[in-house]
Amino acid sequence: MFNNDKVKIGICPIGWTNDDMPDLGKENTFEQAVSEMALAGFKGTEIGNKYPKDVKVLKRALEMRNLQIASAWFSSFLTTKPYEETEKEFIAHRDFLHAMGSKVIVVSEQGHSIQGQMETPIFDGKHHFNEEEWNLLAHGLNKLGQLAADKEMRIVYHHHMGTGVQTTEEIDKLMSVTDENLVYLLFDTGHLVYSGENPVEILKKYVQRIKHVHLKDIRPEIVSKVKNEKLSFLKGVRAGAFTVPGDGSIDFEPIFKILAENNYEGWLMIEAEQDPSIANPLEYAIKGRQYIKEKASI
């Protein structure tokens, strides 16, 4: 199966507190979140809004718990704002992650995104990039990829519901118009299945460019409700569309098998945003970690 020296298991803080909807988990502190991550058996995390902004403070808090920073989300606006604005913010983001020892930077284009809009139907209101926007995106991502490479890091592009890169066709387009040596892919099981894509086929096609993995499961009955009732992405999260691996409908065994057979190296991150007042974060973290141990032997 996996080379246990090359693959690390982490969990994102969004199960404890939601940066897009701060009322979800507002009672959960940074210290509680990272302590429970360590208690549940994880080795890493991504950065949330409640995390200390000082490198020394953050490092000390994580070292006490034997945790590392795997990465952190970066919103680019390459299709809607001057490139220089994104670059300036990216460099600061890159340098912080570099200081924390991270090797990958999660990037998602938020120009024209509806993922943060509370009333826009996620299945009906999505923007589709025109050729000019694709060119702006590709050119900008290649530049960001080079800036990451300058620090011996990589950018991994996060396909996401409600954005211009969501579907199989859009992922194919992104991969074809960007430099394969500068722009890599983040593989997110939940967003692919939510969108109606086949995650196994996408994984097979791009496994050599996939350098970061988000493991999330879906509750199909909630996704159907979101579609039928024309709900937004955020309302879907509140309703419980996502959950940890093993608690929904996705079969992760073939996914683990393909990654292992292709000698995947890097992080496998549980990222499962739901209401922590309903889904206790520690309980679900333990549940997800146990599932990975059972199915991936890691």
Swiss-Prot record:
It is an enzyme of class 4 (lyase). It catalyses: scyllo-inosose = 3D-3,5/4-trihydroxycyclohexane-1,2-dione + H2O. It comes from the Bacteria. Keywords: Cobalt, Lyase, Manganese. This is Inosose dehydratase. It comes from Clostridium botulinum (strain Eklund 17B / Type B). The keyword ATP-binding does not apply. One of its GO terms (molecular function) is myo-inosose-2 dehydratase activity. Its cofactor is glutathione; Co(2+); Mn(2+). GO terms for biological process: inositol catabolic process. Its EC number is 4.2.1.44. Pathway: Polyol metabolism; myo-inositol degradation into acetyl-CoA; acetyl-CoA from myo-inositol: step 2/7. InterPro entries: IolE, IolE/MocC, IolE/XylAMocC-like, Xyl_isomerase-like_sf, Xyl_isomerase-like_TIM-brl. Belongs to the IolE/MocC family.
